[in-house]
């Protein structure tokens, strides 16, 4: 079977994203597991980062399997990828990745923002204890979404598009299908809304803090200002990956793009950039992770 230029380009992009994603997410898992072995316990943020690494690792594997079948086994793609088992895994890892990213943004917002409201301060001092419960809630929410999603007969819907020739029938089927998909995935808008709110709060907090510093210390930037800026850079980068994945994911689930077209493969590439790029930013924004990653690279070079 001859491969189109779009398919070849997709293979190259996916291979690069897959290798990057497996490396950086595997690193997050290994580093935190090593800390667990050494100290017999983990800080809440370390647990969160390890969970993020595991969820990204799983999502990267699922997306790679999808790409493999779409390129090399197109006839089996619909039956395998939109079957109950693979659909459950895809929806579960997509949902839990978004929820864990939201938990991380909440952590940054509570720890760094300078709001003094009583409710905010109450959450700020209790966030370490709340993280395990947030992670458990994320898992339960993701399992629920994935369980509902497998009830939608995706494979049948996609095959109907290929078999039907009547424009009216095809349009009715497509409208029904999109309605089902959007209804099922409506729950994913909730973590997106929380993420946007946390990013906005960090922006407001940075503006207020900078304004106070300019009037009180003639523009001197202290450690708190640097923490605000670094956290904001990280969260905004997260936000870009978050939005791009969410938009590509929702577009993909409407089946509006021609199968194996250039746009189809591009959508898959955008989705695969999220679990790898997101974790790269986590490592780059943490000096300890940077040092550990450099040490691992040096060991590999010596070997």
From Swiss-Prot:
The residue spans the entry assigns to the Cytoplasmic side of the membrane are as follows 32-56, 101-102, 151-185, 256-277
Residue stretches spanning the membrane: 11-31, 57-77, 80-100, 103-123, 130-150, 186-206, 235-255
Membrane topology term reads: Multi-pass membrane protein
Where is it mostly found? Answer: membrane
Q: Which residues lie on this side of the membrane: Extracellular?
A: 1-10, 78-79, 124-129, 207-234
Q: Which domain of life is it from?
A: Eukaryota
Q: What does this protein do?
A: Bitter taste receptor that detects natural and synthetic bitter compounds.
**What does the sequence similarity comment in the record state about its family?**
Belongs to the G-protein coupled receptor T2R family.
> What's this protein's name?
Taste receptor type 2 member 2
Instruction: Give the originating organism.
Output: Homo sapiens
């Amino acid at each position: 079977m001859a491969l189109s230029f779009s398919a070849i380009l997709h293979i190259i992009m996916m291979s690069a994203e897959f290798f990057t994603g497996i490396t950086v997410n595997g690193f997050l898992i290994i580093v935190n597991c090593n800390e667990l072995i050494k100290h017999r316990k983990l800080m809440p943020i370390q647990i969160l980062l390890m969970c993020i690494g595991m969820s990204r690792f799983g999502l990267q594997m699922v997306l790679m399997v999808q790409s493999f079948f779409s390129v090399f086994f197109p006839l089996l793609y619909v039956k395998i990828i939109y079957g109950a088992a693979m659909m459950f895994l895809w929806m579960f890892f997509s949902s839990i990745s978004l929820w864990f990213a939201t938990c991380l943004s909440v952590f940054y917002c509570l720890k760094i923002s300078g709001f003094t409201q009583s409710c905010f301060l109450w959450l700020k001092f209790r966030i370490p204890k709340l993280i395990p419960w947030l992670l458990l809630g994320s898992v339960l929410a993701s399992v629920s979404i994935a369980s509902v999603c497998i009830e939608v007969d995706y494979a049948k819907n996609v095959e109907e598009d290929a078999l039907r020739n009547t424009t009216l029938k095809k349009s009715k089927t497509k409208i029904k299908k999109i309605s089902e998909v959007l209804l099922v995935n409506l729950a994913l808008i909730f973590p997106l809304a929380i993420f946007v709110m946390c990013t906005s709060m960090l922006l407001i907090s940075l503006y207020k803090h900078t304004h106070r510093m300019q009037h009180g210390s003639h523009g001197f930037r202290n450690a708190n200002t640097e923490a605000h800026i670094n956290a904001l850079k990280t969260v905004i980068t997260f936000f870009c990956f978050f939005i791009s994945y969410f938009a590509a994911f929702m577009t993909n689930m409407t089946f509006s793009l021609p199968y194996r077209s250039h746009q189809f493969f591009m959508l898959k590439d955008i989705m695969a950039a999220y679990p790898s790029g997101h974790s790269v930013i986590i490592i780059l924004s943490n000096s300890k992770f940077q040092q550990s990653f450099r040490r691992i690279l040096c060991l590999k070079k010596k070997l």
